[in-house]
Amino acid sequence: MILSGDYHTHTPYSHGKNTVLENALAAKAKGLKEIAITDHGFNHIIFGLKRKKLASLRSEIIEAEKLTGIKVLMGMESNLISVDGDSDMTESDWKYFDIYLCGIHEVVRFKSFSDMRDVMMKNYAAYKLGKKPSDKVIENTTKAYINIVKNNPVDILTHINYKCFCDLKEVAKCCSDYGTYIEINTKKRHVSAEELNIMA
């Protein structure tokens, strides 16, 4: 397989180390044709992208494209913030972005305490204890992933099953139905080879 793009990169606008231009230069050196700058979503308490910085980020992206010849997409790795499938990239934000990633993350402002408890806290407790979450927790996480895909124009779900466990087959079927890709993230081991076969 020849890779032509990298659609999950960060910059100092969230917690990345390299600038937009440095990411584009690295992509060009690796023979890639395009990349996406997908800094963490607005509700991330520590690393969240700020709405007031969007114009500056777009300006850097335009400049990086000119200097490198690489196609640079402006995106965001938004945060899933409720079981109902809400995201911190709201409908009014969609027009600012070229690509829409979404995942479940820690240290995020959820829509409500019950959403944080049901989507993150119970999953994370099981993860830290090395146990499988209850069927109800898996059901809630699965519902959250399915709802985010159904209710939003999500292009890519990021690192599903990393600390937050779902029914992979059900989520994969929903993504297939709605044209949403599922990221396989080699930095965060989140699905096994057997689970990949289940999702296929």
Name what the model sees in each region.
Residues 47-178:
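Extended substrate/RNA-proximal surfaces in nucleic-acid metabolism proteins
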Residues 179-191:
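His/Asp/Glu-enriched short active-site or ligand-binding loop at hydrolase and phosphoryl-transfer sites
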Residues 4-14, 37-42, 157-161:
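Histidine-centered catalytic micro-motifs
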Residues 1-8, 116-121:
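N-terminal small/glycine-rich loop or linker at the start of catalytic domains
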Residues 27, 65, 175, 199-200:
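A generic structural signal for well-ordered alpha-helical segments
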Residues 36-37, 101, 158, 183:
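Conserved beta-strand positions in the central sheet of alpha/beta enzyme cores
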Residues 13-51:
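Metal-associated gating/positioning segment near the N- to mid-region
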Residues 15-19, 166-172, 191-200:
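Histidine/acidic-residue-rich catalytic or RNA/ligand-binding cores of hydrolases
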